[in-house]
Amino acid sequence: MAQIHVANLTFCYEGSFDPVFENVSFSVDTDWKLGFIGRNGKGKTTFLNLLLGKYSYSGSISTPALFDYFPYSISEQQMNRCASDFIDELKPGCEEWRIICELAKLDVSAELLYRPFKTLSHGERTKVLLAVLFAGENDFLLIDEPTNHLDQGSRETIKRYLKEKKGFILVSHDRDLLDACIDHVLVLNRQSIEVQSGNFSSWWENKNRRDHFAK
């Protein structure tokens, strides 16, 4: 188990005078199952991109962990190929047998890897890409809205799958998914981030209690 330490993180988009984050500090363990909670447009995706090193910032983010992000960006050229042909472009060094093991946990056949990606349903594509994501070793995973545009059956499958995993930050508007899959909450406030133990419902109950006493 390792940790991710964020210290005095400050970030502002170029041309903006209002910081997205200002002097944010916290630490999390890399085997936690974190749900990232906050209103739309308040910086969740920005923070994930900071972890991925896409933007410059002041302060520090220190960890021995390697980050990987879902959903992967699939090019038009890759859409015409089988996933087995471009797995290494998404996750270099990933072994196919590990992906096949993950697909079994997602209740789908390994045969999906050998069909043109564009012929797969949205749910099948999601499951293939999640299998690739979790087939690596020692990665800390950033999972952004994995159940978007999926039917109820696929959402339930992914909920069961993620419930057995650890070492991730999950961004989702699906409260049922968050309740089932997380053991800690990252709460995005106006310009800060706080960490609480528990799932979405326990955080919501605590928030309502604090709001009530603040009146």
Residue ranges and their predicted role:
Residues 1-214:
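ABC ATP-binding cassette signature C-motif
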